[in-house]
Amino acid sequence: CGQPFASKGLPEQADAKQREVEQALLKASRNGADPIVIDTSPCSLRLKRNQQALGLKVYDITEFLHDAVLPRLTLRKLPETIALHPTCSTTNMGLQTKLKAIAEACAERVIIPDRVSCCGWAGDKGFTLPELNASALRDLKAALPEACQSGYSTSRTCEIGLSLHSGRYYRSIVYLVDRCSQPNTS
């Protein structure tokens, strides 16, 4: 989607890659006839900017799960405490409430640490400047109770850093929905 280039301060390359992806999505979606679901929020945010002009219907995984998938499932709330990390992109799209609602539908207790707002990965800079990630997540481990053994988010790079600095395994919110759901048979 161009995000790695954008995070490196290379806007022309980012825009070129985004246009390339948009053209591929137009083809894959039969010129916008089919919806596109993006499972990483930073790319969703970038691709949503031009969706109307291109005739695409782009959905972030959070809004797709909340609006289209959950109503079709029977959920069994897990007797667990989980951590949830709304990414910067999730917040910028105004989807943090839907993300929290998904998590609360699936787990008995959801922890969103107050002092952790950004994972500090900054696109892909966490690979080359790990101190950004370490600084942003310095309060994470202490903010999670011992009973909290897993975490969920909507960006794989954020999840890498969150896992590293929390001592818990973070992964996509899709996995949580999968763990607690069954198809609605009615």
Outline where the language-model segments fall.
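Iron-sulfur cluster-binding electron-transfer modules in prokaryotic oxidoreductases
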Residues: 1-186
